[in-house]
Amino acid sequence: MIFVKIFKKVKYSAILMHGEAVDEYEKLSGVRPKLSYLDKKPVLDVGYVSASHSGEYSVIAYSDKEVGVDVEKIRNVSFARYFMGEIGKPYSTERDFFREWTYRESRYKAYGISVNRATGRDIGLHPDFLLGYDLCVVGEGEILFSWSE
C-alpha cells in the first residue's frame, strides 16, 4: 500500500520534507521510524519515503516498497524546445510535457532508473484533483491520498 499526503501552502527543502515524513508516519502508525539515506535516497527503517514540492503544494509518499512521487506546477515553458531524452518528441501542450516529466521524475525517485528501462512493475498514476498541477505516484500497490491545509 502507498500512502500519499498532500500539503497546501507548505514549502520545505527536501531535508525538512523528509523530517516531516518521519513525523507524519509516526502520527499514522504510532511508531517513530528512523530516517537514513541510501545513495542519496531517503529510506525509513519501516519502509520507503519520497517527497516533492512545487508552487503551493508539497507531497510525501510512504510505502513498504519502493515509491516515487513528483508534483509540478504546470506553467508556460518553451516546451517545443524540450525533448525528453531518448523519446525525442516535442509535446503539443504544457500538460503533456509535465505529465511525462513527473512520471520520469517519480520513476527515478522510486527505482533510480529512467523510464526507458521499463520493468513492467509499476504504473504512473496521475490524479487530476490538483488544478494547474501534475502529480504522479509510481510504486506497487493500492494508493491512498490524504489532504492537509
Residue ranges and their predicted role:
Residues M1-E149:
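Core catalytic alpha/beta fold that binds nucleotide/phospho-ligands
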